[in-house]
Amino acid sequence: MAVFKLDALRAIDMSKLCFAISLLCAVAIATFLHKLYKARSFMRRLQREGMPMPPHHWLFGHIPVVAKIFGTLPPHAHLFFIADQVRQAYPHLDSAFYLDIWPFGPPSLMTISPELASQFTQDKSLPKYEGVRKFLKPLTGKKDLVSMEGHDWKHWRANFNPGFSASNITNMIPAMVQDVQTYRDIIRRHAVAGDIFPLELPTLAMSMDIIGRVVLDHEFNSQKAYNPLTSALIDQLAWCTIGVHSNPLEYINIARPIVHQYNAWRMNSYLDPLLKLRYETVNQRPKSKYVGDLIMSAYVKENSPDGRPTKMDPVFAEFMRAQVKLFLQAGHDTTAASIVYTFYMLQKHPESLRRLRKELDTVFGPDITATCDVLKEKPQLLSQCNFLLAVTKETLRLYPPTSTARFGLPGFYLTDSDGKRMPTENCLVVANHHGIHHNPRFWPRVEEFLPERWLVDESHPLYPVKNGWRPFERGSRNCLGQELAMTEIKLVVAIMIREFNIHDAYAENDLEKGQREKNLRVNGERAYQITRGGGHPSENFPCRVSLVANKEREIP
């Protein structure tokens, strides 16, 4: 009898469990269907109102359109290609369009017009998209400058600005030259060896060393030896995909939080004693313009009655770690990729290369071995290289490293040149830099590399459209480090380009790997940008490097 009762109780418990599971599944399905209906009906309403968008399916939304486009692109092609690909497929969508890919993302309003992008970044600054914060959280804990809004953001942005000003960055050029010299020595060894190597990897290490100097006045020596902080930060970035990827499997990777915690511990173990020492001695550097010192000085001034640093508050220590990690990430990632693309563009356009080398001979003298010494003595000479600036800007036009994602507000509309008002409420609003920079409606000879467009006057057909160039975004929340990035790109190119010829080796690399080249291009471009934070050259840009022969430098 007792056994019978026990079996009955077990059967009852099992039935309750099955009922609970069934109920949870029913609730989950009902919730999913409700959200699906809400997303699709919202977009169908916009479609009925004449809002611009590709063909919309009542059940699948724009998922078939997006899937078809990405089916034609190579693996890991950057997500920001979608805007230009949609424009090519539907030429009438040449200013903005809505996309509905729920459950892979919220309803989106994609802008590829300078005028429309300026309306929500310059005329009014919409709040940052929550996905950006989710992406950065494992790295910074959501306490960084990018994640801030309102008064906190204004306060700290004002404190950071002097550290990234043009004059301050120019003063740091002599220190930056040291890291570029190390980089030059590494590239020279590859030139002598004649091997194929991924150019972006040593470039990333150099950029990390430079941003370490600018932020902390600290030598990471990432180019020469293993550094635990930079290694952990790069590894953490590889695992920071939540918020920017649409793959739902990214959300159920059980290893992710473990890796995040481990890398955070590695970074904090390196940073904490370094920051503690800088904080305790900050008053010994009253005129320091290093970014870390600026943050600490502002905090001491506001929180210490006698103006002297006391014990570092744990909350402020966490805040400091967040800013340093953010600046290290932002200061090396996209800049390194842009340097590589600048070399690539010059390789593909020998006339521009010859003109640039001639300008550098004029500004720094014909002795290429003296370039570094000249820059250390007269760093302001870099600003006299007008064609170098034009080359840099044109490269960033063709290969913008990021885009801008904001979130719409009730009652806020974007208005196109025809007077059409597009609602932003409940929408991810994107200024797609790649789509804007490659839009033939706004750029004559849009796919051509033409540094000259940055040197002509307003009456010339090539003169850039107002607000059209936005690799660092525009408006109050533009990239804080754009002056550093532009200076670093120009500095590296000025030192390297007269000594080395850098040629991509994709054909050899593909042959060696047995890859079918026809499946590895975007708009005919093999060095297409891939998703890894910002846009990076595919496969880290395999290349060969050779030394420039004397006859190559005999420029008429």
From Swiss-Prot:
Keyword Nucleus: no
Catalytic EC class: oxidoreductase
Membrane topology, from the record: Single-pass membrane protein
A GO-annotated cellular component: membrane
This enzyme's EC code(s): 1.-.-.-
Coiled coil: none
Catalytically driven reaction(s): motiol + 3 reduced [NADPH--hemoprotein reductase] + 3 O2 = 4beta-carboxyl motiol + 3 oxidized [NADPH--hemoprotein reductase] + 4 H2O + 4 H(+)
Family: Belongs to the cytochrome P450 family.
Protein name, per record: Cytochrome P450 monooxygenase polC
Source organism (scientific name): Polytolypa hystricis (strain UAMH7299)
